Amino acid sequence: MHNSGGQSGWNLSGEERKPFSNYGRNNQQRRSSGGGGRGSHSQNRAANGNWPDAGSEGGQNGNAFNKFRDPQQELDNHQPNKRGGRRNRGGGGGGGGWGGRRGNRGRDSNRRGGRNNSWQPKDQHVSPGQSNMLYFDNVGDFTEDPPLPRSSPAPSSLRQESLPPVTFAADLTPPPPVSVAPPDVAVTPEEPTVPLINIKKEKEMEHKSKIKQFVKAEPKSPKKKKVNSSRSSSTSGEESEPEPGEMVVNTKAVVVPSPKAKAIKTPVASTPKPKAVKPVSSSDSSTSDSDTDDEQSHPPAKSKKMEKNTEEDVVCMGSQERQFTITDEEESTEPEDDKKARKQKNKGKTVDVCGICDKKGHTSFQCQMICRNCSGSYHGLKNCPNPPNLNIAIQSFVEFAMQQMTAFHCEQGFGFPAGTVTAPVSAKPKKDKKASIKKIKKSSQKRMKVEPKDHDEEDDEEDDDEDEDDSSESDDSESSEEPHPAPVSKQKRKRGTKASVSAAASLPPQVFPFPLLGAPGAPFNSMMYSYRAPFNFSK
């Protein structure tokens, strides 16, 4: 390291470092502002020789970066005075990451007695790219060597090294099933599955550069099978064995008849690589590959047929007259059903039957509509044949409103029957009010008088037996007093009720110029329902 020159004078033990801790933090601030002499921390750290370790901690201990500090890291590092002074050398908040060079050179100069000015020109030797990389990467307590593999470019390079074998494996494994396809194209044309089609498309995309279209030549296939059967007889007698052998022969044969490719549209990817990779495989793998490829090879043909059918359906659906029938049943997609639906639609224009009035020529929706101009039944004409008569507009509206009110009873708070009379409570005569007030006052006074007598009786009974006669007399007096107010109050109540009833009866029946709205038995009023010349007020 660069520090080796000045360590002799400043190689302090752990005990000597502790008193410098606070001083070092002050130096940290001093250096950041451009002042400050020899920093105790920089020199103490030189004795350690563990710069990236110290840097990560010291830089992160600045005022701005205490938030992001991990407290456990502080506990793990047994060098308390690492914290000061590192931030200034790294510049900015995370100075710990500036690697070893910048900080160490600065500290060397400090150790030799130089001022801070001595390490400014040495900073110029460090390119900003290096400093930025190390600033982001050096995070934990490490010696000078470990942070380099931890830096961000290193793992990406490692990943790039690990990726190529994966891509090779991906390239090597898929082609063999693709090349097995040619002999079995005509064997199993059924079982289309969508995911296999997608797989086939992906494989074709991978090998586009080497794809060549292949002709089904049926007479050639038995010859190939004869050639391969001799090979397969040595391994096993199963029928599925010749297929992997065919793969090798087919790849050779496919390369030759490339001019015939445009005759039949069954593209099959054929590459020379599979020969070296997979000369002859086990019967199980070959059968599975052949099955999958059969399924892969044929669905495109069926999908084309399906596309044709769908196109035909779309063409049949619409005509120039733009008559579409939207039905929930799936059967309507068939052309016969479409024709029937069209015939019904053509008839429907003339034979619409209303579900409300059972009349032909309009729908139930039109039957509910009203002309907004003449308020007549819906006629669907741009120019209304019945212009509105403004002379009877108000009266017609009032008639409509009254009909609505008679049909729909509104809340009882607004509508009263014709024979209702106001409640008598609101029309009390003054005498009744005075009597009620007097009653309240008298009753309260009597209750107040009775209560102390009762207390006196209880005290007399407890103290002396001679006063029993007095108590009995008082009881008698109370009993004699109690029955008197009751009939008085009853009589007054009777009088009040009689007066109220008589007052209500004496009132003449209320007369309303118009029948109450919402009255169930409202009589017919010629003013409201006049089917004659409009009413004119006399001037």
From Swiss-Prot:
Skewed-composition ranges (Basic and acidic residues): 67-79, 199-208
Q: Where is this region: Disordered?
A: 1-345, 421-513
Altering T292A: what's the impact?
A: Strongly reduced in vitro phosphorylation by CkIIalpha
* Outcome of substituting S332A: Minor reduction of in vitro phosphorylation by CkIIalpha
SUPFAM superfamilies, from UniProt? Retrovirus zinc finger-like domains
Q: Indicate, by first and last residue, each region the UniProt record lists as having compositional bias (Basic residues).
A: 80-89, 428-447
Q: Out of the domains of life, which is the source?
A: Eukaryota
Give GO terms: molecular function aspect only: nucleic acid binding; zinc ion binding
List the record's Gene Ontology CC terms alphabetically: cytoplasm; nucleolus; nucleus
| Primary residence | nucleus
Q: What happens when the gene is disrupted?
A: Lethality around pupal formation with rare escapers with a delayed eclosion time. Reduced size of neuroblasts and ganglion mother cells with no effect on cell size in wing imaginal disks. Grossly reduced mushroom bodies with degeneration of Kenyon cells.
Residues in CCHC-type zinc fingers: 354-367, 371-386
Gly residues composition bias: which ranges?
A: 90-101
Enumerate the InterPro entries for this protein: Znf_CCHC, Znf_CCHC_sf
Keywords, A to Z, come to:
Cytoplasm, Metal-binding, Nucleus, Phosphoprotein, Repeat, Zinc, Zinc-finger
Q: Where is the composition biased (Polar residues)?
A: 1-11
Annotated function: Required for small ribosomal subunit biogenesis in neuroblasts. Plays a role in mushroom body development.
| Protein name as it appears in the record | Protein mushroom body miniature
Q: Which organism was this protein described from?
A: Drosophila melanogaster (Fruit fly)
